[in-house]
């Protein structure tokens, strides 16, 4: 790791956030351009469609993921949970999935051995839909996103297909990146933890031209990390420069790039014996030491924002992503009758992907007969090419055995006998329209629809099979808001979703036919309230999400999938976010979700969905006093997750409920910030998620993290 260590030392490493020098005022049509300095950007100003600047504290008064405009949340008939930059900093998150623990209604799912963009469940519905500035990140097999260049995380609840296209009805995640700033600064930080993390970061920004029309932002993160898991370590390097050019007062061009190098040890966690946990220490590694997987992921965004006049605005954007993954792992497939000897297979992966996306959005504001409109018209085109070479041994003929209680590693590697070599091309064209309608001071409506034209060509070269499919789908959405008083809004919405089932399936590939697409329906009723002058947002919602033709792991054919029929999730959620006082900030929520199979030829009707707890909740609170103690901050977090199904086969295997407590303290002085975080302060033993009895991911034992940030 010599190059990585050198990068860490030279970087000085930052963990802190860039603090806005002024509060941000948002309007329906536009958002602040970070580089504009004090004041606000009006509808005639220089905002970017689909982006939003820094917000102070834990504020969530506006979010762009629901409508791609910065309409205040209380006026939008959709629920969006937000984790601003201060949340990421307060919990010392290095990856965005750590923040999910404090976003209500988001449950962890399969993390693919730590390799890729994790899957998660929103409102009980599993998804891997994650976006960055509105562009899809879950194409190919990129590494989990680093938190260093993230300004805020938004979780859209309910169907988002009316804007984003093929997706899942429970919701999606959209990451908003840090943007160029006129304020000149450079921030160095360093972060270490009790499991061997050494992390360095840089965050810098300012003007590149004397007249301030060319601005930049540069983020770097370099780290080497250990783990509470034996033989599991990782290295990661992120380089993320952004440059914006204000060509004219009405036109701005932004170029944003990101380069990621990632090395990890593929880790499927621990196993259960007779569907019971706790027989093995959570540190026990059941793979093969020394086997690493390497990932390269490079992306480019180019955005052109143009203002025609005070009411009309155009955004043209392109996104390119290319990456590759290569490595080996050993994974458990069976256990012998002695309940201690497991059979493993050897897995060799070589993946490559190329993604190109083009987007065009036109936003206009106008009145018709006294009714106000904010109209969004858009189109996008996506092309994804991927090659997946996945080779493995046969655990039945070459068991690659391991004693789980007294493991002896370093056996001769078994021969590769089961090849899989896939080529896949996906193209998708979307046309969409949305209207935010102001019917009166009390009543607002949201209507929208998207048309998707989807094409897929899938080739399995090893067995010379082929699947081609074309689909056309319309995804409508509608909602209504009633504000009887300025501080309260009652709302309802309904929307649909569409997702083609792609990739290999045992039956479908041999027949040469495609699986039917997943379809979804979601609807909710709720209330939002802004308290304390709008600094605290409360949301209550009752929801129901239905999904058909769900693709789930096939228990009879490892590595393949089947369409499970229909599932349903219904429940309610309560959230509170923002500032209770200038000294106290809060992010809290509780979710009740009853998520079950409603129709299936394999799984029992009524079986709970994997990794979805019926009860879950979290609370993160930070207090920073004024006066003589100004600069000190103390806080804590509580994460509670109920019992949930541990596999998708309806076997009765259950992950136990848990409550984990975190604590934090920091001190800001002059241009520095020092902090101490303690994750799982009471060292609670728990399990985050599982895929089946052979793939169970234990939660972290007590972890101490120290960080220092210096800003110039």
Language-model segments: residues:
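Outer-membrane beta-barrel translocator/receptor signature
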Residues: 148-151, 162-241, 247-251, 298, ...
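Face-selective signature of the C-terminal outer-membrane beta-barrel domain
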Residues: 300-323, 345-459
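Membrane-embedded beta-barrel scaffold of Gram-negative outer-membrane proteins
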Residues: 305-319, 323-329, 491, 517-579, ...
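Structural signature of Gram-negative outer-membrane beta-barrels, strongest in the C-terminal barrel
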Residues: 244-248, 258, 353, 371-376, ...
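C-terminal beta-signal and adjacent terminal beta-strands/loops
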Residues: 639-647, 666-712
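Acidic, small-polar-rich N-terminal luminal/periplasmic segments of exported/outer-membrane proteins
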Residues: 32-183, 525
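Acidic/polar loop-and-plug regions of large Gram-negative outer-membrane beta-barrel proteins
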Residues: 223-227, 239-307, 320-353, 396-428, ...
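Gram-negative outer-membrane beta-barrel transporters
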Residues: 544-546, 563-648, 685, 707-711
